[in-house]
Amino acid sequence: MRWAIAMSAETLAVRVRGLVKSYGSVRAVRGIDLDIRPGEIFALLGPNGAGKTTTVEILEGYRRRDGGEVSVLGYDPGRDRAKIKPRVGIVLQQTGVDRYLTVSETVQMYASYYPRPRSPDEVIDLVGLGAKRDSRVTTLSGGQIRRLDMAIALAGDPDLLFLDEPTTGFDPSARREAWEVVKNLASLGKTVLLTTHYMDEAQYLADRVAVIAAGRIVAEGPPATLGDRDHAAARIRYRLPDGAIAPSGLTDAPDGNGFVQVASKDVVADLNRLTGWALANSVTLDGLEVTRPSLEDVYLSITGETDASLPGGEPRTRCG
């Protein structure tokens, strides 16, 4: 049995059991368990003060834990940080680089710190800065500097990459470009631990997400099934012509924008009934749409329910 437990820790990129950390009388982390598989993008979500930063800093080896077991790439970051450091890349929210070096000089400098670095030119191309290779950092845009931060983190060819709010302050186009860079990393077999406040970012990038609130993991699973959102009632929304009355059971109170909406547990049957009625009565259903709760809806619901129930224990939701 002990052999099986040891093997599971070695074969996971990150394994956490019963992680605890306090600051004086404040319990920042209260018994967290996490498994992150090699090659996956894992997003850690949670409100400010929930314990995300403390948890990540413990995994990175920058903060000591009070209790629990932590394995990162098969090592304890509290004892073996020197062994982990060459295999880990970190992209912080804010980093400082010499603004008068070129992009190429910057990446080459950081690559020289590692025993087996990735080719600087390859890293620069990977993050989409090939055209800026010989440009000085001072001439780069905010989004390009963020790409450079990522190139620096990749210079040592890490197995595990920590991304802390990687697209904060980006415009929509730059965010999409950054997402593709992260996707490329996963395609190379890199493991990525992402912290973000953007739910669409987690939805697009993450294979699995965990929601942390008040120091505990309160939900975990693929974005599509987190909090059973795939089984939640769908919302059918449409606009009726003046004077038209929809079939009973397929109309709720108007939403205030001239649309009617109804919660549906059987979308196919309800849509068939609604559209059949509309065809039979020559009624146009303007703006007809069907939606399910978004990841943001589920996240707000989960964290709201958790905040209301603390400090008592809350169930942990596992999905997939």
Q: Language-model segments: what does each one mean?
A:
Residues 178-265:
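ABC transporter nucleotide-binding domain
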Residues 161-165:
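Catalytic Walker B motif of ABC-type/P-loop ATPase nucleotide-binding domains
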Residues 108, 112, 118-133:
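Conserved ABC ATPase "signature" region
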Residues 225, 232-305, 320:
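Short, charged/small-residue-rich alpha-helical element at the C-terminal edge
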Residues 68-76, 84:
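Conserved ABC transporter NBD signature motif
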Residues 157:
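Conserved catalytic motifs of ABC-family nucleotide-binding domains
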